[in-house]
């Protein structure tokens, strides 16, 4: 069974109202100003704040978004999490009871738009049949954190179950003569 966590871009209407976003995550913090939204206001700002390109061209590709995917197969489970903005030293994976907790944080640093600091916490429930003691974690060169664990498959041998026959009826009711 595959459970894909969709990015909010995929759950939006085709042409959303970007002036007044309905959810906090629909607000594009840290992005450039789009002069098409407020024409009278745009003349007061420096062109360095303007956003270039059409709105559809600004949609991030899959590789640029912080997606997470949970895959649950019959013999194993895997969590894939995009953490490319963090170094291995800034990541922490813990198992607390039946939950896997992933934390990442880095201090303020400069990027192409200015200064940014990032932090996130994610919790995943350990699937049934997975021993938390054998869960492993690895970080790929392109910044994908993979958490895996084998599922216990019960090796119950097949056997035939004999059928016995009772002389009494299963449902008590009026006696037929």
From Swiss-Prot:
Modified residues annotated as N-acetylmethionine in this record: 1
Keywords: Acetylation, Eye lens protein, Metal-binding, Zinc
Segments of skewed composition (Basic and acidic residues): 155-169
Positions bound to Zn(2+) 2: 106, 108
Segments of this protein annotated with the region Disordered: 155-177
InterPro entries to which the protein is assigned, alphabetical: A-crystallin/Hsp20_dom, Alpha-crystallin/HSP_16, Alpha-crystallin/sHSP_animal, Alpha-crystallin_N, HSP20-like_chaperone
Any one GO MF annotation of this record: metal ion binding
Keyword Zinc: yes
GO cellular component, one term: cytoplasm
CDD domains named among the record's database cross-references: ACD_HspB4-5-6
Keyword DNA damage attached: no
Residues annotated to bind Zn(2+) 1: 85, 113, 121
Domain (sHSP) ranges: 58-166
PROSITE patterns, A to Z: SHSP
One GO BP: response to heat
Subunit text: Heteromer composed of three CRYAA and one CRYAB subunits. Aggregates with homologous proteins, including the small heat shock protein HSPB1, to form large heteromeric complexes. Inter-subunit bridging via zinc ions enhances stability, which is crucial as there is no protein turn over in the lens. Interacts with HSPBAP1 and TTN/titin.
Function of the protein: May contribute to the transparency and refractive index of the lens.
Cross-referenced PANTHER family: ALPHA-CRYSTALLIN B CHAIN, HEAT SHOCK PROTEIN HSP-12.2-RELATED
Family that this chain belongs to: Belongs to the small heat shock protein (HSP20) family.
Protein name: Alpha-crystallin B chain
Organism name: Squalus acanthias (Spiny dogfish)
Top-level taxonomy: Eukaryota, Metazoa, Chordata, Craniata, Vertebrata
Name of the gene this protein is made from: CRYAB
